[in-house]
Amino acid sequence: MDNLIGKTLDGLYTIQELIGAGGMANVYKAVVSAPGGPVPEGTVVAVKVLRQELMHDADLVRRFKNESKAISLLNHPNIVKVYDVSVSENLQYIVMECVEGMTLREYLNERGGKITSRETVHFIAQILRALDHAHRNGVVHRDIKPQNIMLLDNGQLRMMDFGIARISRAENQIQNGKKAMGSVHYISPEQAKGEETDPKSDIYSVGVMMYEMLSGRLPFDADDMVEVARKQIRDLSLIHI
């Protein structure tokens, strides 16, 4: 059993169950169990906790802290809200809005990977509004993909997972050398090359998603992830719907 289940962080957030596991962090459903916090007592929240075995990895800790900083700059109906960021008993965690629904990836898979043009416009418009808000606040997401977008029952989207977002304000620029960041099927050519990103990189990724929604396939695919990245760089003229 997960040793965090039943634990209360900072006397405020009582962990109830594991709802998501990733390479960098686990996400738990929790309840605000005491007054005095940033949200009312009894509120159900999502708590994203950096995996304990990764606490020694300076790069991952930096990325995790960067996510909390990125989201804290944003307040938009299509972006998951962040309520609190803290360290408790050597646990780095972010307290966020608990969103009930499915990922856009799951929604597409249920429909054979392809949806109508009407639905596509409905979804893409929400994503672009969220990104416009993020970009106006100096945040470049850098990992736009269907897996990082939640779909609520009412059709509204919530963008999440700013783990490799870049704070693009001059005094807080975070660069990553020549390391490509993002999910290879959706990254822009400059990301595939490990070059500097800007808001246009996110727009490219949205274009890949739009192509996928309308056609039912990815513009670039291969068995080898390195080859997918190479195609992103060299084969743009070969895309056909």
What are these language model-derived features?
Residues 16-22, 27:
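Protein kinase glycine-rich loop
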Residues 123-124:
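Activation segment signature within eukaryotic-like protein kinase domains
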Residues 49-73:
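AlphaC helix of the eukaryotic protein kinase fold
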Residues 128-139:
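Protein kinase catalytic-loop region centered on the HRD/HxD motif
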Residues 85:
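Activation-segment/catalytic-loop signature of the eukaryotic protein kinase fold
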